[in-house]
A protein has these predicted regions:
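Non-catalytic, conserved peripheral segments adjacent to functional cores
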Residues: 1-99, 108-109, 114-116, 121-134
Length: 135
């Protein structure tokens, strides 16, 4: 990954292992144990996530449910277990402002055009790299 883009610097983002740029913005102070997880997890977590034109979020799986929320830039092509949806501002033409990826389901994403895309992702139970795998 190259030099940190200006928006990533402004938002204090770092490279993400799946591609793109991220910064954790919130981690619930509430923690609990739940079946299928090794140890306690925060009730939920949130990140800002930035993809530039030509970048992608590589196919990966997160154990928990993940809510994607579109903020700005161009549309985002989100692949959820082979089905593609588009997040973006043009709701009149079928773009969505948010989408949920169920836990344990493969996902990938990329800008649908030639603009950057800024989204947030909220994960519950909270994200832990122990629950993440590249597919």
């Amino acid at each position: 990954m190259g030099e940190r883009p200006e928006l990533a610097a402004v938002l204090d983002m770092q490279p993400h292992p799946e591609g793109g740029w991220y910064r954790e913005t919130w981690r619930s102070p509430v923690e609990f144990m739940t079946s299928g997880y090794d140890g306690t997890r925060a009730a939920a977590t949130a990140i800002h996530f930035l993809l530039l034109p030509g970048e992608r979020s590589a196919p990966h799986t997160v154990r928990s449910d993940e809510l994607w929320l579109w903020h700005r830039g161009g549309p985002l092509l989100l692949n959820i277990d082979g089905a593609e949806i588009v997040l973006g501002p043009d709701v009149e033409h079928g773009q969505l402002l948010q989408a949920v990826v169920p836990g344990g389901v493969s996902q990938a994403a990329r800008p649908a055009g030639d603009q950057y895309v800024l989204v947030s992702c909220v994960v519950s139970p909270g994200f832990d790299f122990a629950d993440f795998r590249l597919d």
